Structures are given as C-alpha cells and as structure tokens.
Amino acid sequence: MQKIASSQETILYRLGSPCYKNRFYILTGPGSRELLARPEVVGFPCYSALLEETVAALRYLSSTGMGGDLDILTILRGGLNYPLEEACALAGIRVRDMHFLSCERIIRDHVITGLDIRYEKLRPTSGRVLAIGDIIASGATLRKCLD
C-alpha cells in the first residue's frame, strides 16, 4: 500500500501488486475513521461523514487523469450508504451508469457465516472506470460481492 496523496487528515492510498490488473485505492479520513470507531452510526450521518473526503479524493484522481466518465457500483447494506454518486457530481465527474448489489449477512449462532446476494444489477461497460464506494473494515463483504 502506497500513500499517494494527503490533505489535512485525509489520506489516499493505492494498493499495488503485480497480480492486480486493476487499480485499487483506499481512502481514509476523519469521517471514515469515525465510522470504524462508532459502527452504530447509520443513515444520513454515515453518508455525510464520508462526503467531503470522497470529493477531495475524486478531485485529486481527476486532476491526475483518472476523471472522465465512470460507472458506479453501490453495495447496498442496510443503513450503510456510500456517497459516491453525489461526490462525483460535486467533483465534476460524469456518472454514466449505476450498478447495484444488495446483500445480507448470513448469521448462525451469532457468527457471520456467509453472504446472501439478494438483488443484482451489474452490467459494467468495457473500457470504463468502475468506481466502488464501500465502507470496508476487513474487506470480506466486498470480496464476496465481487466473486
């Protein structure tokens, strides 16, 4: 993981590995750190905590040539909503298409044992950036959604 940009308390990292064909970025800032420390925060407070730092990261990526048109994949999980579409609009990035995965954790005896995809609208366009906004602690849900 390589730090590629920082602004005040917000840091943007790029994940790098010879086995990756795609580019992956991780954003951390005051809002995302607050959500990790207070997982009970859901709904609009969750959404608004992430907006400013997401706009800053998108503006940075756009200034380095990563802007332009893109598709968005939103992973719907109860009260956790990532503000990627609004952040793109504020950063001047055009969203061409929206894709969705709705998932629900499978819990047995108070242990998360899997993930059930309840709804899927995922038809990415070849040659276009697919931006995924998600709140990741371990990455397990994201990996299962993309499998």
Name each region found by the language model.
Residues 1-147:
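PRPP-associated nucleotide enzymes
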